[in-house]
């Protein structure tokens, strides 16, 4: 597709706080009222959904009716199911060609999307291919030749498959960019633009982004036709049900002793521990192992097979404590996690909700504990102010709360 002309420049409808101004207020309160396929409804209810979330009430209908949609929403709002349901509704499962493409910033998120979409489409006989680096190109080519309806992938591998003529984009009717801000911040702009140019001129574009920096606005202005704009406000991305505490560790080098003390007090079912660097993840994992704590770790330097194994063990519960960087903070759904420890406060305040939202997602209760040095005091206050929340000093009775 080539650049399109819009009646409204989207950058003109973003306020000083970086929030997009919505232009669509139709709300559908029930999945039954969305005119979805019967088999798709079975998949939705079988997945465990009872009623649509705020973004699902607003975005599914315009997406299923072919409109271009920009949704400003973060992890934990139900956005993956929003575009998954929309794609499953729009595609013809009897046509064996690729009809929808979803791009995501990380392999883990792409795999998560594929799993959610497959579960929702359980009764539809739909073939969905995760198209990601670290896996066999030849296998992907074989599967595409055999017949795939939906491709979910990362920009690098998707672009590669298009260039090899393995991925035919000529019949794609719906193109979804998930976490567009994250993809662009990782330097994928050229690849994303190349993929856009390979699309049919009339392709429907759905873009989801937690923030609206200028790079995202450029994409919306160039490639989307008078899009419907939907904002799921910050206060709908609830921290409700998550008890948030901090421990004043004073110095960075005292964090490890503090973590060991916490282990002695708390019986951890499953926990995620976030560090800001890969090196710190490795160092902390080594120290914990030396001290007879069973932990696993995950970061971007690992190969795909290793990362898959670690995530599988953690999801199944055979691994109980996962030490990771922000690679896990966006979009990876680990249902059993009751405790999140920010060993380092996130360097980006937007990532705070991505990290701790994991512990209380979809109404589950959870506890988040932040290790705070003297240098972090101001940052902690900024996080409290940004989310209009309160982070209390950790009480001695913490074991009763987890």
From Swiss-Prot:
SUPFAM superfamilies, per this entry?
P-loop containing nucleoside triphosphate hydrolases (SSF52540)
Q: Which PROSITE patterns match?
A: DEAD_ATP_HELICASE, HELICASE_ATP_BIND_1, HELICASE_CTER, Q_MOTIF
What is one Pfam family matched by this protein? Helicase_C
Keyword Protein biosynthesis part of the UniProt annotation = yes
Which CDD domains does the record match to this protein?
Answer: DEADc_EIF4AII_EIF4AI_DDX2 (cd18046), SF2_C_DEAD (cd18787)
Query: Catalysed reaction(s)?
Result: ATP + H2O = ADP + phosphate + H(+)
> Which GO biological process categories is it annotated with?
cytoplasmic translational initiation
Indicate what this protein is called per its UniProt record: Eukaryotic initiation factor 4A
Q: How does it assemble?
A: eIF4F is a multi-subunit complex, the composition of which varies with external and internal environmental conditions. It is composed of at least EIF4A, EIF4E and EIF4G.
Motif Q motif covers 29-57
What terms describe the molecular function in GO for this protein?
Answer: ATP binding; ATP hydrolysis activity; RNA binding; RNA helicase activity; translation initiation factor activity
EC number(s) reported in the record = 3.6.4.13
Which domain of life does the protein's organism represent? Answer: Eukaryota
Q: What is known about what this protein does?
A: ATP-dependent RNA helicase which is a subunit of the eIF4F complex involved in cap recognition and is required for mRNA binding to ribosome. In the current model of translation initiation, eIF4A unwinds RNA secondary structures in the 5'-UTR of mRNAs which is necessary to allow efficient binding of the small ribosomal subunit, and subsequent scanning for the initiator codon.
Name its species. Answer: Caenorhabditis elegans
All copies of domain Helicase ATP-binding, residue ranges? 60-230
């Amino acid at each position: 597709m080539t650049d399109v002309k819009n009646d409204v420049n989207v950058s003109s409808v973003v306020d000083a706080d970086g929030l997009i101004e919505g232009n669509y207020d139709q709300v559908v309160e029930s999945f039954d009222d969305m005119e979805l396929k019967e088999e798709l409804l079975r998949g939705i209810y079988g997945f465990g959904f009872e009623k649509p979330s705020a973004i699902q009430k607003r975005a599914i209908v315009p997406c299923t009716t072919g409109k271009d949609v920009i949704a400003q929403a973060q992890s934990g709002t139900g956005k993956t199911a929003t575009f998954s349901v929309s794609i499953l509704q729009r595609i013809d499962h009897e046509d064996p060609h690729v009809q929808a493409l979803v791009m995501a910033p990380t392999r883990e998120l792409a795999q998560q999307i594929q799993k959610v979409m497959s579960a929702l489409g359980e009764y539809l006989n739909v073939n969905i291919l995760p198209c990601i680096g670290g896996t066999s190109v030849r296998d992907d080519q074989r599967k595409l030749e055999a017949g795939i309806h939906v491709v979910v992938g990362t920009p690098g591998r998707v672009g590669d498959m298009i260039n090899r003529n393995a991925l035919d984009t000529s019949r794609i009717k719906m193109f979804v960019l998930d976490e567009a801000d994250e993809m662009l911040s990782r330097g994928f702009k050229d690849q994303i633009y190349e993929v856009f140019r390979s699309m049919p001129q009339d392709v429907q574009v759905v873009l989801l982004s937690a923030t609206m920096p200028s790079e995202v606005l450029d994409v919306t202005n160039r490639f989307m036709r008078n899009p419907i704009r939907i904002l799921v406000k910050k206060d709908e991305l609830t921290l409700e049900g998550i008890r948030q505490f901090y421990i004043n560790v004073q110095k960075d080098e005292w964090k490890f002793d503090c973590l060991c003390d916490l282990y002695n007090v708390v019986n951890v079912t499953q926990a995620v521990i976030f560090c800001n660097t890969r090196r710190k993840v490795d160092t902390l994992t080594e120290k914990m192992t030396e001290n007879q704590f069973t932990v696993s770790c995950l970061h971007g330097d690992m190969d795909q097979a290793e990362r898959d194994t670690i995530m599988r063990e953690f999801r199944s519960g055979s691994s109980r404590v996962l030490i990771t960087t922000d690679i896990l903070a966006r979009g990876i759904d680990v249902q059993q996690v009751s405790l999140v420890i920010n060993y380092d406060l996130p360097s980006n305040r937007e990532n705070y909700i991505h990290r701790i939202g994991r512990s209380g997602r979809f109404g589950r209760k959870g506890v988040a504990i932040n290790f705070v040095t003297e240098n972090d005091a101001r940052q902690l206050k900024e996080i409290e102010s940004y989310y209009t929340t309160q982070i209390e000093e950790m009480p001695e009775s913490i074991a009763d709360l987890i």
